[in-house]
């Protein structure tokens, strides 16, 4: 199976490696959460130019490298590997920069003061996500496998386990 060489991609990105990481991540999350868009980008019967144009419409501020990368994935029928690419490129960024990824998930967009408080005890590159399913609170997941669940959903699940034992 053909795949993108993430090391070469990192070298090509140069000083824009972190920006590219964020762009790849955001686009992969968009496709992950939107079945219709995912189907559109993966459908080889839709002309490649139409799919590339859609990327520009969705992300008009995307970098030239990002547009060329997605164009390459479309042309080579590798767009299905975008999730894999996002994951492995992010891991490479962590190794190269020494800044591990920390994913912070909340039920709604956090106010800046709460973000700053979380940033005080987390080190590395941080990604803030919104997932209404956690009801309230936050979940923090470190790239090294550590996990803190201070969400209301997590507390309710723990309470359910205690009661059912």
Language-model regions: role of each:
Residues 1-165:
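Elongated, mostly alpha-helical coiled-coil "stalk/stator" tethers of large membrane protein machines
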